[in-house]
UniProtKB/Swiss-Prot annotation:
<dbReference type="GO" id="GO:0034599">
    <property type="term" value="P:cellular response to oxidative stress"/>
</dbReference>
<dbReference type="InterPro" id="IPR007219">
    <property type="entry name" value="Transcription_factor_dom_fun"/>
</dbReference>
<dbReference type="GO" id="GO:0045944">
    <property type="term" value="P:positive regulation of transcription by RNA polymerase II"/>
</dbReference>
<dbReference type="InterPro" id="IPR036864">
    <property type="entry name" value="Zn2-C6_fun-type_DNA-bd_sf"/>
</dbReference>
<keyword id="KW-0804">Transcription</keyword>
<dbReference type="GO" id="GO:0003700">
    <property type="term" value="F:DNA-binding transcription factor activity"/>
</dbReference>
<dbReference type="InterPro" id="IPR001138">
    <property type="entry name" value="Zn2Cys6_DnaBD"/>
</dbReference>
<dbReference type="Pfam" id="PF04082">
    <property type="entry name" value="Fungal_trans"/>
</dbReference>
<feature type="compositionally biased region" description="Polar residues">
    <location>
        <begin position="85"/>
        <end position="99"/>
    </location>
</feature>
<comment type="function">
    <text>Binds to SIN3.</text>
</comment>
<dbReference type="GO" id="GO:0008270">
    <property type="term" value="F:zinc ion binding"/>
</dbReference>
<keyword id="KW-0539">Nucleus</keyword>
<feature type="compositionally biased region" description="Polar residues">
    <location>
        <begin position="239"/>
        <end position="249"/>
    </location>
</feature>
<dbReference type="GO" id="GO:0005634">
    <property type="term" value="C:nucleus"/>
</dbReference>
<dbReference type="GO" id="GO:0006368">
    <property type="term" value="P:transcription elongation by RNA polymerase II"/>
</dbReference>
<keyword id="KW-0238">DNA-binding</keyword>
<feature type="compositionally biased region" description="Low complexity">
    <location>
        <begin position="213"/>
        <end position="238"/>
    </location>
</feature>
Length: 743
């Protein structure tokens, strides 16, 4: 390590360099010369140079909390050249202290950046261990919205390897019974669940890579899951989930095969890398057993899901599901009940987890019950391996539920990955194509409609994720021949009307992106008049959707009696999609998507900028109203939409198309909502700081009665805030950063 240099003057040594880099070089991630009093980089740029000394080190507890929030990822070292990735040397049993049951004593390893020692010392309390069956050679470099404080080593190797010593592995265990069944069909209630066809690459027995330890622990898990309830020797009581990956243990030379090249295994490994939810649960007693949950509370979770989420994604047969759920006598031990298919168990737990988040947003659960969503997701993920192996329409349903739950992770990468898997599986199953006459004769009307609804649910989910991230969709509207959903009985007409509205809005968002923001839109050699004609045509379509839906709602409201109006107001507390405010908010947000700077129109004319500024203020007014009424879900979809509005407001301020003084309330409201996301959403907190600085500047101007003595200085402050905001977005790979540098 480089040390300080000393110059000898008059028999005395004087230090000429510092031990550690200056603050500016650290922030810019540049190599610092460490010269005294000013380093070469700062001297060259005329910047102030200060040496804060060694960065403060975090304690083990602080590191553990940071890893749970996703702020800290241990950096791995490169393997030595020529070293075999699968070493034949045995792992010494004395490398880690063992508890009475053979589990490794919890705590951080002193070699936490060393790959070999990491694999020897897997801890049940470490949230980033090999859970969900994560393979040791899986990449860790998953983009995160809250990784703004993480410094990634450019030379770090994302791969690590297990020692091939068979004695260090858990003895092989069989796959779940549902996986080993022959190719027959098991039915339960309204569900037909075909047993999976396992690829020839998949061995009959799967070798387990354990979560708790990789020494001689012979405990068997259920259905590929392993929950540690042991409390000896100070081990943690928090159960952690481990879904076993495939590995072939029949190789005579002691080496193990890689992940089989089949769709389910590849998708499982991908999910284990990107999705971090449902891995632990805090809903446990001191002895490690799960706490009891009131049955009525679980029923409320299910009801909340069908009142809110089901209207957007109608892939579940509501009547059949509720009838089957009514036969469950013990929800808490459902994961051990062999009388129900694994896919049904997964759906029950995940639907309750999603319903819990809905009631949590509406303020209808106590603070102690808020952690139940993670506990229920934990129970659902115990069946994830069996679900992903099916590779059928049931897999699509379960992945959609998992995708909806992933919205509440403080990152968009997991939902983006899930949406890609869903859409490719959907296309592979041919769900985007209308059934032929021959197939329709062999299917009931209920089965055909269920198939169509699964596709449109997948379509809405994938379009929602893509448009929120500002990315291209995986399927074009011209490749879809499936008819729209239709009501099979009277009671679901209202729900299906909302579903059709969501489909039209998703289609509209996709059309705007394709014709205005896509790369192909920017390559067209069009005149200004032709570009304006495209935007005007899309504006007309959007206005028609809004007008038609507004008229439908007015007509329906006029036909309601007093009892129906009271019931409707109660439903609106849970499902906000029926409110006029939500419809106006979505209308304004799509107008922003249409008029903001784009590939088609990089520099909008002044009249378009004025229209854009008006829709920005309208969209924010409606967003803040929903927020105050507890109708705004605090998930990453809301965050990205908020950032898009913030981005547009900032652009309009720099272009002086929004009055600076009149926008001070909206700017402060931006700060309030961004900060309400909480400490887990560090990315949102940093963006809030930028807008707080803008709000302070506007406040100073308003106190001076609108007089700006130095307009150039104000412009520089706005441009500086814009650059700072763009830098935060760039650091986190956030694609809402669509504005070019303003010069």
């Amino acid at each position: 390590m480089d040390g300080p240099n000393f110059a000898h003057q008059g028999g005395r040594s004087q230090r000429t360099t510092e031990l550690y880099s200056c603050a500016r070089c650290r922030k810019l991630k540049k190599k610092c010369g460490k010269q005294i009093p000013t380093c070469a980089n700062c001297d060259k740029n005329g910047a102030h140079c200060s040496y804060p000394g060694r960065a403060p080190r975090r304690t083990k507890k602080e590191l553990a909390d940071a890893m749970l929030r996703g702020e800290y990822v241990p950096v791995k070292r490169n393997k030595k050249v020529g070293k075999s990735p699968l070493s034949t040397k045995s792992m010494p049993n004395s490398s880690s202290p063992l508890s009475a049951n053979g589990a490794i004593t919890p705590g951080f390893s002193p070699y936490e950046n060393d790959d070999a020692h990491k694999m020897k010392q897997l801890k049940p309390s470490d949230p980033i261990n090999l859970v969900m069956g994560a393979s040791p050679n899986s990449s860790e470099g998953v983009s995160s919205l809250i990784s703004v404080l993480t410094s990634l080593n450019d030379n770090s190797n994302p791969s690590s390897h297990l020692s091939s010593n068979e004695n260090s592995m858990i003895p092989s265990r069989s796959l779940p019974a549902s996986v080993q069944q022959s190719s027959t069909t098991s039915s339960f209630g309204g569900y037909n669940t075909p047993s999976p066809l396992i690829s020839s690459h998949v061995p009959a027995n799967a070798q387990a890579v354990p979560l708790q330890n990789n020494n001689r622990n012979t405990s068997n898990g259920d259905n590929g899951s392993n929950v540690n309830h042991d409390n000896n020797n100070g081990s943690t009581n928090t159960p952690q989930l481990s879904l076993t990956p495939y590995a072939n243990n029949s190789a005579p030379n002691g080496k193990f095969d890689s992940v089989p090249v089949d769709a389910s295994s590849i998708e499982f490994e991908t999910m284990s890398c990107c999705f971090k939810g449902g891995r632990t649960t805090s809903w446990v007693r001191e002895d490690g057993s799960f706490k009891s949950i009131d049955r009525s509370l679980l029923d409320r979770f299910i009801a909340a899901y069908f009142k809110h989420n089901h209207r957007l994604f109608p892939m579940i047969d509501k009547i059949a599901f509720l009838n089957d759920a009514a036969t469950i006598t013990d929800f808490e031990r459902l994961y051990d009940n062999k009388n129900y298919p694994d896919s049904f168990v997964f759906k029950v737990y995940m639907i309750m987890a999603i319903g819990c988040t809905t009631l949590q947003r509406a303020g209808m659960v106590s603070q102690d019950e808020e952690c139940l969503s993670e506990h229920l997701a934990f129970l659902a993920m115990k069946k994830f391996r069996s679900v992903i192996i099916l590779q059928d329409i049931e897999t699509v349903r379960c992945l959609l539920l998992l995708g909806i739950y992933s919205f509440f992770e403080p990152k968009g990468s997991s939902s983006w990955t899930i949406s890609g898997i869903i859409m490719r599986l959907t296309i592979g199953l041919g769900l985007n194509r209308e059934l032929t006459a021959k197939k329709l004769k062999s299917m009931s009307a209920l089965e055909a409609e269920a198939r169509y609804r699964v596709f449109w649910s997948a379509y809405c989910f994938e379009r929602l994720v893509c448009t929120s991230l500002g990315r291209i969709s995986g399927i074009d509207d011209e490749d879809i021949t499936v008819p729209l959903p239709r009501a099979l009985y009277v009671d679901e007409r209202d729900d299906l009307e909302m579903t059709k509205l969501m489909i039209s809005l998703r289609k509209m968002g996709g059309r705007i992106y394709k014709q205005v923001h896509s790369v192909s839109a920017g390559r067209q050699k069009l005149t200004i008049e032709q570009k304006q004609e495209i935007i005007s045509g899309l504006r007309k379509e959007l206005d028609e959707i809004y007008s038609r839906e507004s008229e439908r709602r007015k007509l329906k409201k006029s036909q309601m009696d007093q009892v129906e109006r009271e019931n409707n107001s109660t439903t609106n507390v849970i499902s906000f999609h029926s409110s006029e405010i939500w419809l106006a908010m979505r209308y304004s947000q799509l107008q922003i998507l249409l008029y903001r700077p784009s590939a088609l129109m990089p520099k909008p004319p002044i009249d378009s900028l004025s229209t854009l500024g008006e829709f920005c203020l309208q969209a924010w007014k409606h967003t803040y109203t929903l927020y105050k009424k507890r109708l705004l879900p605090l998930n990453w979809i809301t965050l990205f939409r908020t950032l898009t509005i913030c981005n547009t407001i900032l652009y309009c301020l720099c272009q002086w198309s929004i009055d600076l003084i009149e926008s001070k309330i909206e700017i402060q409201q931006c700060v309030e909502i961004l900060r309400h996301f909480g400490e887990r959403w560090i990315f949102a907190m940093r963006c809030a700081d930028v807008f707080q600085n803008i709000s302070n500047t506007i406040l100073d101007i308003s106190l001076s009665h609108g007089k700006v003595p130095n307009m150039d200085q104000l412009t520089r402050e706005l441009f500086g805030a814009s650059d700072s905001y763009q830098d935060i977005l760039d650091e986190n790979n956030v694609d809402v950063s669509w504005v070019d540098k303003l010069v």
